[in-house]
């Protein structure tokens, strides 16, 4: 089986980010749920072609996302709109009580061998990346290096993700100004 994330892996949500930016706002759950209910996200280049190819070879596809159960209808409609393979309720696995995807991956692995994981966030691959400091995440990437490009296929997401949360130590009440100062402090500059 292939286990894939949805947001910024298969579906492009940049119109939502633009909408929020034009309003001078960051991500917020109510507006996000309005966006996902529209089922209006476009596909990212190559996503459907790749999954269609895998499906044609008998590989089952599971869509593992941290979208909430209240977003199921819109999420399913969005992936069905583009005829992604195995786009069914059974293969759409939404967020449970915890945001870690590990338990949900383990549940899939009870029935299927997971050959490949696709995502835009390290936590899409293994719990060793869940809520860890930047230093620990970097160390774990080094330890898991052999998996990248073979079993773990990561698509860069420079807009958001746990890389950003790790920078401010998962303190989600950090103000936008504080976040900006932290990010500017840790950015790598070109020589």
Where are these regions (language model features)?
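Alpha-helical substrate-recognition element adjacent to the catalytic core
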Residues: 1-99
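C-terminal cap/substrate-recognition subdomain and adjoining C-terminal extension
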Residues: 68, 72-191
């Amino acid at each position: 089986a292939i286990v894939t994330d949805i947001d910024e892996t298969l579906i492009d949500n940049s119109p939502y980010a633009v909408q929020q930016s034009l309003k001078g706002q960051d991500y917020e759950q109510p507006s996000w749920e309005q966006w996902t209910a529209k089922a209006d996200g476009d596909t990212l280049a190559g996503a459907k072609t790749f999954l269609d190819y895998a499906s044609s070879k008998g590989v089952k596809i599971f869509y593992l996302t941290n979208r909430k159960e209240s977003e199921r209808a819109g999420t399913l409609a969005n992936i069905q709109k583009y005829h992604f393979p195995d786009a069914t309720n059974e293969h759409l696995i939404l967020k449970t009580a915890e945001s870690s995807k590990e338990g949900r991956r383990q549940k899939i692995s009870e029935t299927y061998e997971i050959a490949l994981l696709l995502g835009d966030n390290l936590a899409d691959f293994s719990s060793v990346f869940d809520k860890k400091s930047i230093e620990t995440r970097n160390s774990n990437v080094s330890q898991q290096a052999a998996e990248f490009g073979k079993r773990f296929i990561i698509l860069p997401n420079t807009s958001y993700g746990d890389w950003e949360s790790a920078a401010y130590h998962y303190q989600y009440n950090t103000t936008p100004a504080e976040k900006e100062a932290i990010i500017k402090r840790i950015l790598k500059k070109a020589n």
